[in-house]
């Protein structure tokens, strides 16, 4: 079977590296990270990938420049070998730069093609759709369609530990990517704007080598023809790879005491509370030792918010810039003035999206 992982723009290479580190051969094609194998490799990827958004089973690809062509493409796939006759079929679609741009119409045609194929197999007109779910995803770009099954259900960023809201949260998969890009694996880590704790917790999961999907379920576990044994084995494998780390190895701080308590609560849910030391302090009082500092400082779209954020960047310059001889620093922000306000040019800069906000990841290494 062929699968592919999706990732945020420009992070496909990071996702491919993660798969290779899991012992899975991967290649990047058309902004997707493809790999092949049996159910155990799908389970390993779902459980172990940190920066990917979703993982799919690739069903079929082909030309879809008309509704007839799309129907024939869908109908040609072996759906009766993939979807049970009681399976719930959900269709999602994305269309761009194509003749077929109506998402509802595309969804309708794809569902029609699948049902027609199942009708021919099972010789029945009505399907109850009251059993396991099959989430079919259709992407049409430049009149070419990719049809796949979403293996995850909830996106891979849903680790299960973050349940309390915080202002401008960083998605877990993005936080994991920031840590991977700067080369953090295990060692002292600092986050002076911890918010709800995402960067610190993702750092602790990585330091412990705890697979991020170890304690959640995936939609594909219930697919027809899939057994639970592969998932049991891969979860056992992941648990065996967990390592011990020094208590308080990671320091997470914030000027807002309520955010510090929220981060502590999330760390407890993630099972990494002992790895993180939480402090209530402003960034201007930061004083860390050797290690890595990765942070998502406040930023805003309104003038007042921007001015406040820029004052914070100057505080960072006072407290963090003198420590760069012993700290590797990574800062994600959409503000193109960051380097000037911080008072030093970055050694590397990478474009990254935080949700739909285009940011730069400034690295001082």
Report the location of each language-model feature.
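Short SAM/SAH-binding signature in class I
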Residues: 290-296
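Conserved Class I SAM-dependent methyltransferase catalytic core
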Residues: 2, 6, 10, 247-249, ...
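A short, flexible beta-alpha/helix-coil linker loop
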Residues: 96-99, 155, 298-302
